[in-house]
Curated annotation (Swiss-Prot):
It comes from the Bacteria. Belongs to the diaminopimelate epimerase family. Its EC number is 5.1.1.7. One of its GO terms (molecular function) is diaminopimelate epimerase activity. Keywords: Amino-acid biosynthesis, Cytoplasm, Isomerase, Lysine biosynthesis. InterPro entries: DAP_epimerase_AS, DAP_epimerase_DapF. The record marks 274 as: Important for dimerization. It catalyses: (2S,6S)-2,6-diaminopimelate = meso-2,6-diaminopimelate. GO terms for biological process: lysine biosynthetic process via diaminopimelate. This is Diaminopimelate epimerase. The record marks 164, 213 as: Could be important to modulate the pK values of the two catalytic cysteine residues. Pfam families: DAP_epimerase.
Amino acid sequence: MLIEFTKMHGLGNDFMVIDLVTQRLELTPELITLLADRNLGIGFDQLLVVEPPMRPDVDFRYRIFNSDGSEVEQCGNGARCFARFVQARKLSFKQRIRVETKSGILTLSTDNYGWVEVDMGKPRFEPAEIPFTPKAITKIQNAYHLDVEGTPVQLYVANMGNPHAVIKVDDILTADVEKLGKAIESHPAFPERVNVGFMQVMNQRHIRLRVYERGVGETQACGTGACAAVATGIREGWLDEGEEIRAQLYGGSLLIRWSPGYSVMMTGPTAFVYEGVFSPDGIMAQAGLKPLS
C-alpha cells in the first residue's frame, strides 16, 4: 500500500501533509517518528493530517503531530498550509473553511496569492489555562519569575490553543535559545511542556522572534508563538493594539493583529515543496519494526 503525501512549509516551518479523507492509514508514534527522520524518512517539523469532520458545523478535522510522535493541540503555520492543501487537492472549493482541532475551532481564509488569514481565537493568560503550575508563584504584574536550573527567569505565559512562555530579550541573536528553551520546555512548572518564545521589541509595530517548540526544538517560524508574543506585547503596552504587527522570524514575517477581548488574527504565506508516496510497511520494516498491516 502506498500513501500519497505533500511537503509544504510556512516560513520554513516544514510539514508533511496527508489526506486521510480519501486515503486510509493507521498512524502510530513509531511510524510518525520514522517519517520525521530527515536522513531516513521524509523529514518535517510537524505532520499535518486532514480527516473528515466529527461534527456537522465544520469542514474538516485538523490533527497535528510533532516529530517525536506526540499529538499537539495547535499549529498556526500548519493551519495556513492546511487551508491551501485542501484547496489544491480539491477537497474543498471554499475560500473560507472551519476546522476542528484538539483545542477548538479555527476559521481559515485563503486569497489568490498563497496567503492565508487564520482566526486563532482569544489568547488566555491565566496559569491554570496554560497550564502553568510552579511550586511558588513570584509575580510582578503579569510577569512570572521562574527558577530555571538555579537561575531566576522572568517570563510571561499565554495559551493560543497550545501553551507558550514568552521571554523579552534585548537581542534575539545573543539569546541562549537552545539551552534556556530546552530547560523551560520541560520544566516541571509546565506539566504539558511548553513552547518558549524569545521576543525582541523593535518598535510599536515590529518584533523579532525565535521559538523553541515543544517536542521539536528551535524552528524557522512558529505561528502560535508569534501570536502569543504579540498578544503579550500588546497586553504589556509594548505594541500597538488593533494594528498589524510584523513578527519577524528566521523564515520570514507574519502579520498579527489583536485587540483585548477579541480573537488574534494571523496572516502569512504558504508554499508547496513537492509531492510523493511512501510505503508505511516499508518504512516500518526498514527500522526492523512489525509492519502495520
